[in-house]
């Protein structure tokens, strides 16, 4: 694309994929979306002074006279490459985390561990941009133009480490194509986003793109082997002999060996990088302990001492909305908030709550509208099976009837209202 721009001697001052925000001299990318085709807005972009229009190579539409049109084989990848070429950054170390559950927690723990190690770090993900304090479009993985601008600003602040959540949508849509990460990590894969990916196989393949298109020759790869689809993951990655990931919990040098609770303190033994480490936590569910040690393992792959990092475990704050303790009821019951939006995450939250508390567990939850409907009855069954009491409420119904969503969640489940 850059070669064609040079060949056609196109003078431009930026790129845009949104005709509403395009400025005179921008190159407009007419991206075909799931619901809206960007080619519908080409005339609007031209009227606003677009320097050129980029369309998919298969497009056979006619365009207004005197319009410079460039055809791209993969329009999304072309947009990302050009955006990152325009907004260059010099962040030294980049870490990407993908997975159904645990991305935000691992990113949070990585940021915490890097900061206590005296390193400057920025995180981009579900909770927004930790440095710029924004999440303009409420996306885990921002669109390429926005992301490239964010990274440039982060770089200008002399920040050396980037920790980024890589969503399946972001990977499938090539939102950060052109970036190469020093560490690529996978937390787990379970049922989610099938409204978009249609099948679990498509979903897994989207996650695996991180280990194919976003690595350089010295990249470190790590995967938590305690995931339901580990055999499928291994079979996909085996096809590329240059990809040799480390499997956390299946590798004798990277695993948790013991968790013991004494006086409300969890004492944990683990091995990271062949070093035996001891950690202490207070009111941490087991899956968060696993995420914390997974984060230590990631940093060990790029030279950090796990023994030094492990000393900070007891003082680590809980992650916002991840089995986060928020207070007590009038009768003394402890209240935890967890952003469990998948069947596996809901099960983990309830099971871990029972480990932390001796009393009954009452779960209050809901499912979002206009999203994966298949998981609704699954979550209802899980709540019914594992909680002592379950109540279904509304959780951003969007354009769906809230009562219909609640009915689908409850399904044939018992002890749930």
Segments predicted by a language model, with ranges:
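Well-ordered beta-strand positions
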Residues: 27, 52, 183, 220, ...
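Nucleotide phosphate-binding/pyrophosphate-handling subdomain across enzymes
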Residues: 21, 264, 273-389, 411, ...
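Phosphate-binding loop of NTP-binding sites
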Residues: 77-225, 229-242, 296-299, 356-357
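Generic hydrophobic/aromatic pocket-lining and core-packing "Φ" positions
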Residues: 42, 111, 151, 207, ...
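Beta-strand->loop->alpha-helix junctions that form or flank phosphate-binding loops
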Residues: 53-57, 237-262, 280-286, 310-315, ...
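Active-site regions of enzymes building and remodeling cell-envelope glycoconjugates
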Residues: 64-73, 135-138, 240-246, 257, ...
């Amino acid at each position: 694309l850059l070669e064609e721009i040079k060949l056609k001697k196109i003078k431009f001052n930026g790129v845009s994929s949104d005709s509403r925000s395009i400025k005179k001299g921008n190159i407009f990318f007419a991206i075909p979306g799931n619901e809206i085709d960007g080619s519908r807005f080409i005339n609007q972009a031209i009227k606003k002074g677009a320097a050129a229009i980029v369309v998919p190579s298969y497009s056979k539409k006619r365009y207004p006279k005197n319009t410079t049109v460039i055809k791209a084989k993969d329009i999304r990848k072309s947009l990302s490459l050009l955006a990152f070429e325009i907004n260059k950054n010099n962040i030294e170390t980049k870490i990407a985390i993908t997975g159904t559950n645990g991305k935000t927690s691992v990113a949070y723990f990585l940021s915490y561990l890097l900061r206590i190690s005296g390193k400057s770090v920025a995180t981009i993900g579900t909770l927004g941009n930790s440095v710029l304090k924004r999440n303009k479009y409420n996306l885990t993985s921002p669109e390429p133009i926005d992301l490239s601008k964010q990274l440039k600003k982060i770089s200008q602040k002399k920040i050396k480490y980037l920790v980024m959540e890589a969503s399946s949508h972001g990977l499938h849509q090539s939102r950060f194509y052109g970036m190469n990460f020093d560490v690529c990590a996978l937390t787990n894969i379970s049922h989610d986003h099938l409204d978009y990916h249609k099948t679990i196989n498509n979903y897994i393949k989207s996650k695996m793109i991180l280990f194919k298109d976003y690595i350089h020759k010295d990249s470190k790869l790590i995967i938590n082997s305690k995931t339901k689809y580990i055999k499928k993951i291994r079979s996909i990655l085996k096809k590329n002999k240059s990809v040799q990931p480390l499997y956390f919990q299946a590798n004798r040098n990277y695993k948790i060996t013991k968790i013991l609770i004494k006086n409300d303190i969890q004492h944990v033994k683990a091995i990271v990088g062949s070093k035996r480490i001891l950690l202490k936590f207070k009111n941490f569910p087991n899956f968060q302990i696993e995420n914390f040690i997974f984060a230590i393992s990631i940093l060990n792959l790029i030279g950090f001492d796990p023994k030094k990092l492990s000393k900070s475990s007891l003082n680590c704050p809980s992650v916002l909305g991840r089995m986060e303790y928020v207070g007590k009821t009038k009768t003394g019951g402890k209240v935890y908030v967890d952003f469990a939006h998948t069947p596996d995450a809901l099960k983990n939250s309830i099971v871990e709550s029972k480990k932390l508390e001796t009393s009954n567990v009452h779960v209050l939850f809901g499912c979002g509208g206009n999203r994966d409907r298949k998981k609704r009855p699954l979550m209802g069954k899980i709540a019914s099976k594992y909680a002592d009491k379950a109540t279904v409420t509304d959780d951003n119904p969007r354009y769906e009837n809230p009562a219909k969503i609640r009915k689908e969640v409850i399904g044939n489940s018992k002890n749930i209202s």
